[in-house]
Every structure is written in structure tokens, then in C-alpha cells.
Amino acid sequence: YYNDFSMNKRSKVDGVVNFFRPLVAKGLPIDAIGMQGHMIYGDTDYVKEYTYSIKAIASIGLKSQFTELDLTMLPNPFGFSGANVSDNISYKDAMDPYKDGLPKEKQEQFDQFWLDFFQMLMDNKENVIRATFWCLNDANSWRNDFPIKGRTDYATLFDRQCKPKPAIQKLIDMVKDQEKKALKENKPNKNK
């Protein structure tokens, strides 16, 4: 098993796939390739990029795992990327605009992002074996202090009181709807 960051970037995933291709061909016991998912809302088209990554990894006969999933809705200071927790940028109010909660529009964007992301996972379920989150709730998320100490972030699917955010019920409903549709499509027609 191998797990790495920035696996949504085509050049990175291509490099990883090219590294593992001969090892897989030699029969090395590799179960999966993991992709850390510390995402920044609006930064890039993660669904499109990760779809490519899943397919690239599957092309060498391996499954994908998504690890460390979270999504910051806060502004990205100066195009900052990476997850070196020793990095720290000076606090500025403009970089912490949602101290009192996410505005409704931002919450809806957050929800839609996760609906789209999980739809991608479901569309690629034959090649994805796991998706896990980095933290259970917003109160304990590392995003509150990274890369700017003291910010208030909303990066998980559970709020600061461990209550599910609206995205949870929307995801449950999406899965139920797809299960119903699949059952209906697979139901034998008695009129034939």
C-alpha cells in the first residue's frame, strides 16, 4: 500500500503509476494506492482530477483509497498549497471571514461539493475501496490552525457539536435514490 498527497495532480499520479507499473508487473503484493484529500474549495476541479487519478491507478490493476478527506471553505492565502504543519502564515481578518458560521450560500456550496465528490466515488466504485475523513468534526479539525493559526474552519461533515451537517442527509438521500433506481432497473419484467 502506498499513500501520498497531491494525487489529484496529473503529473504526480502519472509519476506514481509509472513507478508502480513495473513493480505490479513483477507481482509485488501492492493492495492499493491512497490519495490524501486535503482540499480547498474553488482551488481546482477535484472531481475531474481525481476521476483521472482513479482511472490511471486502475490501468495498472490497482484500487484507489481516499484518505484524509476534508474541505476548507476559507480563502487560500496567496495560493498556498501543501500540508506541512510547521508552515504558518500570519493571521489576517480577511483570511478568517466566517468566524460566526458559514453563510447559507457557502454551506450550499460545501454540500454540493461533497455530493459531487461522492457521486464520483460511486461512479468509480469498482476501483475505489475506501474513503476516510481526516477528522470527525469541525471543532477538532487541523484546518482551524493551518496554515493560519486561529482561523475558524468548517472542513468536515460534522459541526463543532458533532451534529451532522446538511450534506450528510443529502448524501444518504443520494445513495438511497441510486439504490432504488438500480433495483428498479434490475427488476425482472413480468409482462415479457
Language model features: what each stretch is:
Residues G34-M39, Y98-L102:
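Short, flexible active-site loops
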Residues V17-K26, L115, M120-M122:
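Short aromatic-glycine motifs in intrinsically disordered, low-complexity regions
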Residues K48-K63, L71-K192:
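Aromatic-rich peripheral "rim/lid" segments of glycoside hydrolase catalytic domains that contact
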Residues R10-L23, N144-T156:
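Short, electropositive alpha-helical surface patch
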Residues K12, F20-D31, M35, K55:
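Extracytoplasmic, non-cytosolic globular domains
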Residues F5-G15, H38-K48, L71-P77, A139:
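Acidic-and-aromatic substrate-binding clefts and catalytic sites of carbohydrate-active enzymes
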Residues Y1-V13, Q65-L69, R130-L136:
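Aromatic-lined carbohydrate-recognition surfaces of secreted/lumenal glycan-active proteins
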Residues D31, L62-F66:
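Conserved active-site beta-strand-loop modules that form the wall/rim of enzyme catalytic pockets
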